[in-house]
Amino acid sequence: MTKLLELKNISHSNKESIRVKGINLTINQGEKIALIGKSGSGKSTLISIANGSLIPNEGDVIWKGSHINNISNIESSKIGTIWQDLSLIEELNVAQNINCGALGKHNFIWALKNLLGVLDKGLCQECLAAVSLPKETIYSYINKLSGGQKKRIAIARLLRQEPEIVLGDEPFSNLDPVLSKNILNLLINQKNYLRIKIPETILISLHQINLINNFNRVIGLKDGEIVIDGEIKNINQSELDWLF
């Protein structure tokens, strides 16, 4: 299997507490990984370190053989992340926000055209359809949308980015169970009816334990350490009960 992302001997702490410790993790191309653990177990910290936005006190993050601090902007754009804090731009409309997902692959002129609203909106509409929003939504402004709609826009922006891997920090919070499962099915089952390429590899933290059966690998964190790592078929209910 092709290694995409490696976390080697990762430990990180702040003044209040140890966040993660002794993390060794390899994510291979095509893996669908659920990251689980109770609140405060270190899931958000691990995601932040994995995408390079948080530098750990100890250890290294390797992306396709290169240290994550040394990769180009184009390579960085191949690592897609969706946060609980969605980071949408309130002053822009939905189409402009979705196209922001592709900024890493284009030049300044393309970015300017996006701000002017003159780019083709077809791909944006396809991304909206993937998250069950009507195509007319592209003309709406972010500050007019509900929390659940904003979450779907953030996921649509991630799809527009066309990353090789998706890192998600509880991306399905604020979404109803049916929609959560539909979007997860899009990522897991690779239904490429879109012109955009659906990412093959995902690492997503979850609080909806009922969704983990959709993944082929489960990682459990407890007090900042990996205590479960294996195929879902090999993890029993008593292990999950102990984890939480």
Regions found by a protein language model. Give the residues of each.
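Conserved ABC ATPase "signature" region
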Residues: 112-136
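Conserved ABC ATPase signature
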Residues: 141-145, 149
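Hydrophobic anchor residue at the start of the ABC signature
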Residues: 154-155
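Catalytic Walker B motif of ABC-type/P-loop ATPase nucleotide-binding domains
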Residues: 166-169
